[in-house]
Amino acid sequence: MKQLVEDAIPKVFSELDPHSVYIPAKDAQRANEDLEGSFSGIGVSFNMQTDTILVINVIPGGPSEKAGLKPFDRIITINDSLYAGNKSDQEVIMKTLRGAKNSTVKLGIKRKNEPELLYFDVTRGDVPISSVDVSYEVSKGIGYIKVSKFGRTTYNEFITAIAKLKQAGCTSFVIDLRGNTGGYMDAAINMVNEFMPEGRLIVYTEGKAFPRNDVYTNGTGTCQDAPIVVLTDEFSASASEIFSGAIQDNDRGLIIGRRTFGKGLVQSPIQLSDGSEIRLTIARYYTPSGRCIQKKYELGKDSEYEQDIYQRFMHGEFDSADSIKLNNSEKYETVMGRPVYGGGGIMPDIFIPRDTSGVTSYFSNVVNSGMLNL
């Protein structure tokens, strides 16, 4: 009966907006843990290379690093069961490696230049998940900060990075939100607050059953006079768009890159008794100028909505600013009277086309063959 209900619920939600969703109990914890700042596991990033688990990265401070695992180790056995040679599903492997805190998993490892398997008993524990991936002085006096998500620990990581960069002599900042699909709104609001004086509108929410709610800066920011640039792309979404929109509409800095994703729906999480969760859309996010961040959609037409990024690519939007169609009916003004446009997502002040000089198909084939890891 439970499975019947779980099979029927997605049909119900398909008639709602594209982001209202039901998450089964078995997936709910995983859906939330990336934003919580840590999870219980062994602390490795891995990939399936042909039919073997290849450790790509060992998370600093995690259980695997403490046990002695290294990048490019190959996991052959897990708890004495063979996982090499049978093309195991990546999701199954992940669930096997994760588990209750303080439980132990035995790994059989093949390491370069070691003739025999090495065995490690790894005690699962809290694995830190960083959301500020990197921060450094990119040029004299200019600090660069890459924020990959807006999680529970993001703001603290961010102000720590700012403090270190200031100590190194940085007086202006580049905030990189490319590929940042969002997270907690509060983290984005707190970050915006660092760059603005008191009384500036950051964002407001409004819905049919929810009256307008404005969020303002409180004047406690430590970088109120520091020049700032924000980097965005088509995968910058949700909280990334709140941050970018607030900076742009308040004329606090420049947005450089490409139009953002266009996800601006306020969702209310509803925890169900069996551990499953409903995320129900209740309102929309608006930038200070009044732009709705959410791109347009039609109820019940999720497939068209999901094709939006592909259609933007096909129309040349990632390669040429001229391919972006600006609608004068969606024209708004910043605090200083600059024109900005709505219609979904945040339009950059300076357009940068996608990088087409990256990885070649030949290089991809070499990596997939395993030749670089011999």
What would you call each of these model-derived segments?
Residues M1, P24, L54-N57, P63-K70, ...:
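Cleft-lining beta-strand/loop regions that shape enzyme active-site pockets
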Residues M1-V21:
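N-terminal activation segment of mature serine protease catalytic domains
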Residues K2, V21, K112-L117, S361-L374:
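Peptidyl-prolyl cis-trans isomerase
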Residues D7, H19-N57:
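PDZ/PDZ-like peptide-tail recognition elements
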Residues F72-R74:
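Structural motif
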Residues I78-N79, K110, K296, G343:
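Residue-level recognition of conserved beta-strand edge/terminus positions
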Residues A239, D251, R258, G262-E330:
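Polar, glycine-rich mid-to-C-terminal structural blocks
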Residues C292-I293, Y297-L374:
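Conserved functional hotspot residues or short segments at active or partner-binding sites
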